[in-house]
Amino acid sequence: MLSVKRLNLDSSWHIKFDSGNFIIDPWLIGSEIDGFKWLNQQWHIKEPVKVENLPSYDFLLISQNYEDHCHINTLKEISEDKPILATEKAFKKLRKEFPKRNITLLNDNKEIKYNDLTFITFRPDKVLDPIYYAVVIINKNNEAIFYAPHGFVLNDSQLSMIKKFSVSLLITTFT
């Protein structure tokens, strides 16, 4: 069973995928700043779900290190009992901010099993591009969610890795 609920008009989601029940990229409080406040600060156009009103969930998935995905002020308001799975750059940021929290690193191009789901993280090939990760979330029936909130171009190796799965849901931007 797959259930998807949008938590804001950016990239925060609540996903139920078989036995997996998790929140992706929660930015639910205040503004987000990319770089310098005077250069690029963004606010929600529509009020997001309040932290205290989040649906039940077992863990968090943080896909990017950017503040609209890895929002420290929101994460400070979420119970530290909730484990976090994070891509490499987000993991480094989170480990500095929350040294005692249960945070699992999702290594690039490796299958990581967690709560009856498998996670594969892809990073782009181009060295000069910003690092925008994609995460594939697979259930025990080889059905998958492909989450690439900034878009993503698969290389041949990554494409061959996901060909064995049936992608049921694509969450991405189309800009």
Regions found by a protein language model. Give the residues of each.
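Active-site-proximal loop/helix segments of hydrolase catalytic cores
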Residues: D125-T175
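Active-site environment of divalent metal-dependent phosphoester hydrolases
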Residues: L9-S11, S31, N65-C70, F91-L94, ...
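Active-site-proximal beta-strand elements of phosphoester/diester hydrolases
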Residues: S3-R6, F22-D25, T118-D125, A144-G151
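N-terminal pre-catalytic "stem/leader" segment of glycosyltransferase-like enzymes
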Residues: M1-K16
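Active-site HxH/HxHxD metal-binding segment of metal-dependent hydrolases
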Residues: K46-K110
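Metallo-beta-lactamase
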Residues: A86-N142
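Active-site neighborhood of phospho(di)ester-bond hydrolases with catalytic His/Asp-centered motifs
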Residues: I24-D25, Y57-C70, L85-E88, F146-G151, ...
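Pre-active-site segment of Zn-dependent metallo-hydrolases
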Residues: G20-L61, N73-T74, V153-K164
